[in-house]
């Protein structure tokens, strides 16, 4: 009885571990800038994401003070889409960017943020200057956003940088931001990000507030990866003094659509799919049709199920190897299947948890985890093993020296290997020379 209970607890622990990895969302790169000349302030935003549902929507003030426009692509259930950038009627704009900050002690005696989407919308609905935003945010434990940095800009040109534990107001005529917390990031480290470095260099050559200039600046900071052409999903230029926004779709800066905030708010609350505003974009279609465990339930279930299968069968074959003392044909394969199974179990977890693996060039290199980087060579291991394993599988089918269960599990393992090799080829994991 105790053995059964321990087994159930062990399986539950495995499932919990896998599910934890599956629900982790990868960081999303973004960049932005603000430019102020005289009484004109422009705010530019690049939203780099693998989502395929970019939207712009307009919300009137209701019981709050100011109507606002927002852009975003991540659906947040009953809250609608989570805002990534936006601007209100008073010329206050913002952008949210993913950034690392080491955890510290949370703020005491402050309000908790229980609904981040509503919280971010309420700031634009309630504030008209960055000073008011700072006062508003100081009421909350904004360390809730431990993986984010925000920039707020008002039409005077002042800006507020919101980090998990720091609020900083500035008033320089230009400012460029990307995926880092400025208070803890030396300039030489920030310059390692191409989009930030390119933006700073562009501004050093001179600034103005024409739409052509602001578009060119966004263009030089956009991302487009070679593998499938993914990168910047939505770009926006917010004119904080005139209350307009120019949208650009999927790093194509030749076509833009402009909205006037006050005119749109007169139409009532409404939401528009950004894709419908622009001509057909083949690169975006490529992104939409590219399947991974993150956007395909079938592939996701297969990867998670394979992880469980590899872990359990690796243990099974190890026990089988030591349990049967008589000399069996190819018994060394059973011993070999243990490290192979553990290795593949780990790789399935990597594939379940990191979307970057599928979009960055092969072999994928993780700057923070050497084991994930090494795991990128596992597809080649399967290529080397599949033919000899298939031959041994065929011979074992003739004499069945492993027993029906052992032979069945080995055969099923080989079938999974073949499917995985096909998926690895589809994801271009073998294209290491491109």
Predicted regions mapped to residue ranges:
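Selective detector of the "anchor" transmembrane alpha-helix that sits immediately C-terminal
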Residues: 292-323, 384
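Sec/Tat signal peptide C-region and signal peptidase I cleavage site
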Residues: 24-29
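C-terminal, well-structured catalytic/ligand-binding subdomain of enzymes
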Residues: 33-81, 85-87, 92-125, 148, ...
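Secretory/export targeting leaders with adjacent low-complexity proregions
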Residues: 132-152
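Bacterial N-terminal signal peptides
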Residues: 12-22
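N-terminal secretory signal peptides that target proteins for export/translocation
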Residues: 1-9
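Alpha-helical transmembrane segments forming the membrane-embedded cores
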Residues: 298, 319-434
């Amino acid at each position: 009885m105790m053995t059964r209970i321990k087994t159930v607890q062990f399986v539950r622990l495995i499932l919990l571990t896998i599910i934890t990895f599956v629900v982790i969302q990868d960081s999303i790169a973004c960049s932005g800038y603000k430019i102020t000349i005289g009484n004109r302030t422009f705010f530019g935003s690049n939203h780099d994401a693998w989502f395929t549902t970019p939207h712009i929507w307009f919300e009137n003030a209701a019981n709050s003070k100011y109507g606002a426009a927002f852009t975003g692509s991540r659906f947040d259930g009953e809250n609608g889409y989570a805002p990534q950038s936006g601007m209100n009627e008073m010329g206050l704009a913002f952008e949210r960017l993913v950034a690392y900050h080491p955890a510290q002690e949370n703020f005491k005696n402050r309000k908790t943020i229980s609904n981040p989407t509503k919280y971010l919308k309420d700031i634009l609905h309630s504030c008209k200057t960055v000073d008011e935003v700072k006062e508003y945010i100081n009421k909350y434990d904004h360390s809730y956003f431990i993986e984010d940095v925000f920039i707020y800009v008002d039409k005077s040109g002042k800006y507020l940088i919101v980090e998990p534990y720091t609020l900083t107001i500035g008033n320089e005529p230009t400012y460029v931001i990307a995926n880092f917390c400025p208070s803890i990031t030396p300039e030489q480290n920030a310059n390692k990000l191409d989009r930030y470095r390119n933006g700073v260099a562009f501004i050093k050559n001179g600034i103005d507030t024409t739409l052509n200039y602001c578009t060119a600046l966004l263009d030089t900071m956009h991302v487009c990866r070679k593998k499938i052409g993914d990168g910047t999903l939505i770009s926006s230029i917010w004119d904080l003094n005139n209350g307009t926004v120019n949208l650009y779709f999927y790093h194509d800066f030749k076509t833009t659509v402009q909205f006037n905030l006050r005119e749109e708010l007169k139409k009532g609350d409404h939401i528009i799919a950004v894709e419908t505003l622009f001509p057909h974009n083949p690169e975006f279609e490529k992104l939409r049709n590219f399947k991974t465990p993150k956007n395909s339930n079938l592939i996701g279930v297969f990867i998670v199920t394979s992880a469980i299968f590899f872990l359990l069968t690796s243990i099974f074959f190890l026990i089988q190897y030591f349990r049967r003392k008589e000399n069996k044909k190819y018994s060394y394969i059973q011993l070999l299947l243990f490290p192979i199974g553990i290795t593949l179990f780990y790789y399935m977890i990597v594939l379940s948890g990191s979307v970057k693996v599928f979009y960055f060039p092969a072999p994928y290199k993780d700057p923070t985890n050497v084991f994930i980087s090494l795991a990128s060579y596992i597809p080649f291991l399967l290529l080397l093993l599949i033919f000899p394993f298939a031959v041994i599988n065929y011979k074992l089918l003739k004499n069945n020296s492993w027993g029906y269960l052992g032979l069945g599990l080995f055969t099923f393992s080989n079938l999974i290997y073949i499917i995985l090799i096909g998926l690895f080829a589809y994801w271009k994991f073998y294209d290491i020379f491109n």
